[in-house]
């Protein structure tokens, strides 16, 4: 594929740009026009810019399995942040000037998706250059979504229910932690429990989704990470799933991470995008996953919702009690109350957003954010400290887990209560270039 290098003869210089910046391309265009290139040529430029950003921001490119030549060119050109921003501006203008795609809805989604990715790229450049951006504005520019706000009173109502469930004299966070300890998976049982759960997640998913016959995954157990689990998609329907063992893993974490990172979560999502869009349509932009982009809201939201889809109603509780509790050699005598607690703790999930919002906006410091998480999310002090590390690295990304799940649930369940219908809408979401705003537009 011929790589088009886009350069307007007169480009507005961004704040970080200087007159000393060298030229950023050999071909000049008087203005970005639709005749300048096909969309595939524009995608080639897009891939080069994202890969160039990855040289400045190590976590920016979450996965890339496209042509190696683009990665080599990004390394060879060594574009500065200002140069990437300039070329992204021209590329956005070119995309906006493309002829109307008429009734081709997929093409419209493709072009809009590229524009949103470029807006997110510009936002990450600004952040890397030291710009201060309000939390909600940042999340909209990166993920095309703004999470709802909740005050302390919202969480206090839920905390009162937990207090009634686990009465005692000690502070509520200490009571919760003491009760939960009996459900920690022993270290020597962790691998067997996780691998059993992941296989069950896979079995249930494959009953509804046709994945490539050669799809596969491997598991690693790691430490010193700010996250609890991670899927590193390798391409060719293969994933490396890492489980962080810094903090204790509870019995419910096995299914949660198995579905989230694997089936029908990240591994499934990436495999379908590769199969349907990269190989099926030749849309090479989907051979690169920019972590800080609207795609992440759908990725994280669908991965979290996928747990409920694969294990509807009480099926998850039954599976864990009948299979994982014995495998972990845990006593299930208090399991019923434990699952009642988990349901209530899930309702505190948005407390993490409030901690991140206040901390990143400078309204509270790290110590205050940690205390908020202990008081209102009922985190252990260790988990609260780990969360601050996550906020430092991933910032407003935190909204993708809970608000993303809510948006995906709304979209999928708008099709009715029939289980198979929900799976079909879920598959549609995972196989298409839908953006977060499409989830509300298409849920009607």
What are these regions (language model features)?
Residues 5-13:
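Bacterial N-terminal signal peptides
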Residues 17-444:
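N-terminal maturation segment of proteins
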């Amino acid at each position: 594929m011929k790589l088009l290098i886009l350069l307007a003869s007169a480009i507005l210089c961004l704040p970080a740009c200087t007159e000393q910046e060298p030229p950023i391309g050999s071909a000049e265009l008087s203005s970005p026009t639709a005749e300048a290139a096909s969309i595939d040529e524009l995608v080639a430029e897009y891939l080069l810019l994202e890969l160039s950003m990855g040289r400045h921001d190590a976590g920016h490119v979450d996965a890339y399995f496209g042509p190696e030549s683009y990665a080599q060119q990004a390394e060879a050109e060594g574009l500065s942040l200002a140069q990437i921003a300039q070329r992204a501006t021209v590329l956005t203008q070119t995309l906006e000037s493309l002829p109307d795609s008429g009734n081709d809805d997929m093409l419209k989604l493709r072009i809009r998706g590229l524009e949103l990715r470029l807006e997110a790229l510009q936002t990450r450049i600004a952040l890397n250059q030291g710009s201060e951006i309000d939390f909600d504005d940042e999340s909209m520019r990166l993920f095309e979504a703004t999470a709802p706000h909740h005050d302390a009173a919202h969480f206090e109502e839920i905390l009162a229910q937990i207090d009634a469930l686990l009465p005692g004299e000690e502070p509520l966070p200490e009571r919760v932690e003491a009760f939960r300890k009996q459900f920690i998976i022993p270290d020597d049982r962790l691998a067997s429990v996780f691998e059993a759960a992941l296989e069950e997640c896979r079995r249930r998913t494959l009953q509804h989704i046709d994945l490539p016959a050669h799809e596969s995954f491997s598991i690693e157990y790691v430490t010193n990470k700010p996250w609890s689990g991670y899927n590193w998609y390798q391409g060719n329907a293969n994933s490396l799933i890492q489980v962080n063992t810094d903090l204790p893993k509870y019995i419910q974490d096995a299914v949660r991470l198995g579905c989230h990172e694997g089936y029908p979560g990240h591994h499934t999502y990436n495999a379908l995008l590769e199969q349907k869009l990269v190989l099926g349509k030749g849309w090479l932009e989907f051979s690169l996953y920019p972590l800080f982009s609207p795609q992440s809201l759908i990725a994280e939201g669908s991965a979290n919702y996928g747990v409920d889809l694969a294990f509807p109603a009480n099926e998850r509780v039954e599976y864990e009690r009948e299979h994982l509790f014995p495998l972990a050699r845990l006593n299930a005598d208090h399991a019923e109350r434990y699952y009642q607690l988990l349901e209530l703790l899930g309702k505190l999930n948005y407390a993490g957003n409030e901690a991140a919002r206040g901390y990143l906006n400078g309204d509270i410091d790290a110590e205050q954010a940690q205390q908020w998480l202990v008081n209102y999310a009922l985190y252990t002090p260790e988990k609260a400290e780990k969360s601050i590390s996550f906020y430092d690295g991933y910032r407003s990304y935190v909204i993708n887990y809970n608000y993303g799940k809510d948006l995906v649930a709304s979209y999928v369940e708008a099709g009715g209560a029939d289980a198979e219908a929900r799976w079909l809408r879920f598959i549609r979401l995972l196989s298409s270039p839908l953006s977060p705003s499409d989830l509300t537009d298409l849920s009607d």
